[in-house]
């Protein structure tokens, strides 16, 4: 039986579409490769640091795509942060509704920001991965 949609390992990750300044991304369009979903905010030091570290690691790998979503409510702060942290902006988005957004609710992020590693079929294979865990999944 195919996995059901949910947020635990082995579940199919809830799909979403998000629009950035230059691009629109639909999670379903990324099937066929590993996807690292990173949820963070500039005011949350741990998630911000993790996002930056993972972003630099993903830039070195060719078999994973990173989708980075910030829940900052001010675009200026978001832009300043990604510049300062040298984040690749290709799949970097800001959800200006912040913690009131549907995406925040869907991924139940109220207990702290998280990241999810999805396999080629959109199934969650790991949560809150570190850089070393990420490279062991991809090798």
Locate each region found by the language model:
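Structural microenvironment flanking redox-active thiols in thiol-disulfide oxidoreductases
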Residues: 48-85, 99-104
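Non-catalytic, surface beta->alpha helical segment in thiol-disulfide oxidoreductase systems
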Residues: 111-114, 120-139
